[in-house]
Curated annotation (Swiss-Prot):
Part of the RFC clamp loader complex which loads the PCNA sliding clamp onto DNA. It comes from Pyrococcus horikoshii (strain ATCC 700860 / DSM 12428 / JCM 9974 / NBRC 100139 / OT-3). GO terms for molecular function: ATP binding; ATP hydrolysis activity; DNA binding; DNA clamp loader activity; endonuclease activity. The intein interrupts the potential ATP-binding site. This is Replication factor C small subunit. The gene is rfcS. The keyword Nucleotide-binding applies. One of its GO terms (cellular component) is DNA replication factor C complex. The keyword ATP-binding applies. Residues 185-308 form the DOD-type homing endonuclease domain. GO terms for biological process: DNA repair; DNA-templated DNA replication; intein-mediated protein splicing. PROSITE patterns: INTEIN_C_TER, INTEIN_ENDONUCLEASE, INTEIN_N_TER.
Length: 855
């Protein structure tokens, strides 16, 4: 796996700059001064009405107090941990020096700092049970990492989980797994001992003489006041009797049945002794009987420290599967020879087949087809070992393919057309280097002599153009990553013609140059393909993750009054918790207004819903009401509910929202986001202060783009900046996305790169095409249209949109502009109705020509 770092250099997982440079405070919001000023007034006064405007998401999640968590290397109940830090107070409490275990973006276990702990109340929980005996009680919106039946691996809200989903479970925990004689002695005592304080006596019972002997040796070593004797009774049972005040004091301090804190530093010794006393082989598994649920849960955590995945059934812990049994015997083992022999036989048996996950076959197939990979496995479910091996094999081939595509892109990045003006300037040098006479070169320059392909290559080479190398790169791309049919479709010719052109030495260089541009576009499409990046990220996760997927068997809702707790882990927003180790989540949001109003408490006073995802009246009646019923945290006078895309709500849902807004107006403020305020019913609009976000000024966007370019080490040319501003049309998100896309091509941001990644034609090209038509040069205008379509890969609708924008910049009178704008609208309607786009675009140019002739 050491070569995986090389794969990371492909940078397929770079965070979108739109998120990276998202404003965190009101002062960072660009170009909406009128809105910021009003919002700051609300912050200053500490009050605000309902608002109608747009903003980003975020919501907090919590667990019940009996949830177990490893913090600073020790196992705690979440309740115990949070109550100790918070002093019992509700809301968030900052904390330093507290570390928990979680997973990073590749599914690898890491230690994370906790920023603060949190305590709250709720009336609704979701209880989740799994095949391995896990039980989690979490708030309905708490996300859990799951593997769904369609192969997706994603965070899913607890209330949306279904039986059959598989829950992410760590395969091991980085806890101390050492040896310790006291831990071993306690393992024997809890497994087969009994204390009688009145008689000052400790008894240990076990039929195995080796274990009795070991218990006596440890007792003598650990307790200097111990008097030890072994007695075999008439019924044949043998017991060890110990008189020791020191030993009695220790065992009386242990409390309820659980793993004593003294045992964690020597957990290996404890487990071996405890399993020797209470464990054994039953059927195809090692089974351990414990004294309590608490003990069985803690045993599961302890086993996870050795990479042993276990299953809980009430008070029993079960270890099954050849791999898990083998790990147990290698890491812990039995001293009892009979148990050891039986367990060794289990190693030879096959695993039961539960250690696997469902694969996102569609996504992996997409990666395979996009990069023309040869290696593949068409199974829909892979074992953990298969997932590691197959995804790693795929990643090796992917790395090779991406590297080859980058090299092909470099080879195709320079045109192969000869600049004959340059040849004329350097005619003597060219003649000398090529062996072609100067007079022949002049005839080539003037077009009086037909140039052979052989001579063309010679001349191009002198000018620094390696035509043969470029053609070979074109052939490689066509054979390995595309098809003659695809290239032919974009070129507007038959695939057989493309093959002939690429494979023959009698080449039409102008057509070859067009093919080069098409192939370069295709390469860039592959390298910037978001779904491909998603697929590669998925495979990296499969190849590196350290997770087991435990199938969910039951999901149920609990009602009542519950105290809930959370740990805030910045950055990765997850930690390992549960009655058995499970990956759970915490999250944050980036709503500038909430940060300003609530400070550190904003997370707990803010709820986000997306109406387009959760349409209908149930959203209003359940989720909104549940959140609105709870009191604000941290002394705030109200909470905020942010409802994104509110115009997607049905009329009934909006009426319910209106009633809810009235019902909870004393402690809740709503922020509604919509694309069209006209779709929001009037009673809601009348209850909101309406904020209309206008397109940003070019100078505001330019300032932000220059800042980002400087931070990212880019050279943002003035031409490149103006091109971005032209395309963005006042949309900051679009501008930043274009900048990031252009940066993937080159650190120098030019207008050429911008128009290329944005799939837009240059405005001057559009104007030139329209002016040619107006001047009566229909055929040249038609040729220019085809050049634009092929060069930029635009759709007919894209061309019409740009024509509509540029027609008002033409040097013609206003009535003509009005007429042509109307015609553009008419032909756009024809395209929407399904007409042939080339015929309609050429017909529109014909209309321009007819108008021009009338003038």
């Amino acid at each position: 796996m050491h070569n995986m770092e090389e794969v990371r250099e492909v940078k397929v997982l770079e965070k979108p700059w739109v998120e990276k440079y998202r404003p965190q405070r009101l002062d960072e919001i660009v170009g909406q001064e009128h809105i910021v000023k009003r919002l700051k007034h609300y912050v200053k006064t500490g009050s605000m009405p309902h608002l109608l405007f747009a903003g980003p998401p975020g919501v907090g999640k919590c667990l019940t107090g009996d949830t177990k968590v490893i913090a600073n290397g020790q196992l705690f109940e979440l309740r115990e941990l949070v109550e100790k830090i918070s002093g019992g107070k509700f809301g968030p409490t900052p904390v330093k020096g507290l570390k928990v275990i979680g997973i990073d973006e590749d599914g690898k276990l890491r230690e994370f700092e906790v920023q603060y702990v949190y305590k709250d109340k709720t009336e609704r929980l979701i209880r989740i049970r799994t095949r391995l005996g896990r039980e989690l009680k979490v708030t309905p919106y708490h996300p859990l990492l799951v593997n769904r039946r369609n192969g997706e691996i994603k965070w899913v809200k607890a209330e949306e989980l279904k039986p059959g989903d598989k829950l992410a479970v760590p395969r091991f925990l980085p806890i101390v797994t050492g040896e310790d004689p006291l831990a071993e002695w306690l393992g024997y005592f809890l497994g087969g001992g009994y204390a009688d304080s009145k008689e000052n006596l400790i008894m240990f019972t076990n039929e195995d003489p080796l274990l009795r002997q070991r218990f006596m040796e440890l007792t003598e070593k650990l307790f200097s006041d111990a008097r030890i004797r072994e007695i075999t009774h008439e019924n044949g049972t043998s017991k060890v009797y110990v008189n020791s005040k020191k030993a009695l004091k220790l065992v009386n301090s242990l409390g309820n049945a659980h793993i004593p804190k003294e045992c964690w530093r020597g957990i290996r010794s404890f487990l071996r002794a405890y399993f020797d006393c209470n464990g054994g082989v039953k059927g195809n598994a090692i089974v351990l009987a414990t004294a309590s649920k608490e003990m069985s849960q803690e045993i599961a955590y302890a086993l996870a420290g050795f990479g042993i995945i276990s299953r809980i059934q009430e008070y029993r812990v079960i270890i099954s599967g050849s791999d898990n049994v083998k790990k147990f015997l290698n890491e812990i083992g039995f001293i009892n020879r009979n148990k050891l022999e039986k367990a060794l036989k289990l190693v030879k048996k096959d695993d039961p087949g539960h250690d696997g996950l469902e694969i996102n076959y569609e996504l992996i197939s997409y990666v395979k087809d996009r990069l023309r990979l040869s290696f593949f496995n068409d199974k829909r479910s892979w074992s953990y070992r298969e997932a590691k091996e197959i995804s790693w094999e795929l990643m090796k081939e992917i790395y090779y393919r991406l590297d080859e595509l980058e090299k092909l892109k470099e080879s195709l990045s320079r045109g192969i057309l000869i600049d004959w003006n340059e040849v004329a300037k350097r005619i003597e040098e060219v003649a000398e280097e090529t062996g072609i006479r100067a007079d022949e070169l002049l005839e080539y320059i003037e077009g009086k002599r037909k140039l052979s392909f052989k001579d063309y290559i010679k001349i191009a080479k002198v000018l620094g153009i390696d035509v043969e190398h470029t053609i070979e790169a074109m052939r490689v791309f066509a054979r390995k990553y595309s098809s003659y049919a695809e290239i032919g479709r974009r070129l507007g010719t038959w695939n057989s013609s493309v093959k002939t052109i690429l494979e023959s030495n009698a080449v039409n260089v102008e057509i070859l140059e067009r093919i080069r541009k098409i192939e370069l576009e295709l390469i860039e499409e592959i390298l910037s393909d978001e779904k491909l990046k998603e697929g590669i990220a998925y495979l990296i996760f499969l190849s590196q993750n350290e997770l087991y997927w435990d199938e969910i068997t039951k999901v149920e809702e609990l009602r009542g009054e519950f105290i809930i707790y959370d740990l805030h882990v910045p950055g990765y927003h997850n930690f390992i918790a549960g009655n058995m180790p499970t990956v759970v989540h915490n999250t944050t949001a980036a709503l500038a207004l909430s940060r300003e109003l609530f400070g550190e408490n904003w997370r707990h006073n803010f709820l986000e819903l997306n109406a387009s995802d959760e349409r209908g009246i149930n959203v209003i009646r359940e989720k909104v009401k549940e959140f609105a019923r709870t009191k604000p945290i941290g002394g705030a006078s109200f909470k905020i509910i942010f409802l994104d895309e509110a115009d997607a709500l049905t009329q009934d849902a909006q009426q319910a929202l209106r009633r809810t807004m009235e019902m909870f107006s004393s402690n809740v403020r709503f922020i509604l986001s919509c694309n069209y305020s006209s779709k929001i019913i009037e009673p809601i609009q009348s209850r909101c202060a309406i904020f209309r976000f206008r397109p940003l000024r070019d100078e505001d966007i330019a300032k932000r783009l220059r800042y980002i370019a400087e931070n990212e080490g880019l050279e943002l040319t003035e031409e490149g900046l103006q091109a971005i501003l032209y395309i963005a049309e006042g949309d900051m998100r679009r501008a930043i996305n274009i900048l990031q896309a252009a940066a993937a091509l080159d650190k120098k941001i030019t207008d050429e790169n911008v128009f290329m990644v944005a799939s837009r034609a240059r405005p001057e090209d559009i104007r030139e095409m329209m002016l040619l038509a107006l001047k009566g040069n229909f055929l040249k205008a038609r040729e220019k249209l085809r050049e634009i379509l092929l060069k930029q890969g635009l759709s007919g609708e894209d061309v019409l949109i740009q024509m509509h924008k540029e027609v008002f910049n033409l040097p013609i009178d206003e009535p003509t502009k009005v007429y042509l704008a109307d015609k553009i609208g008419e032909y756009n309607f024809r395209l929407v109705e399904g007409a042939n786009e080339m015929i309609q675009l050429e017909a529109l140019l014909a209309q321009f020509t007819l108008v021009g002739k009338k003038k």
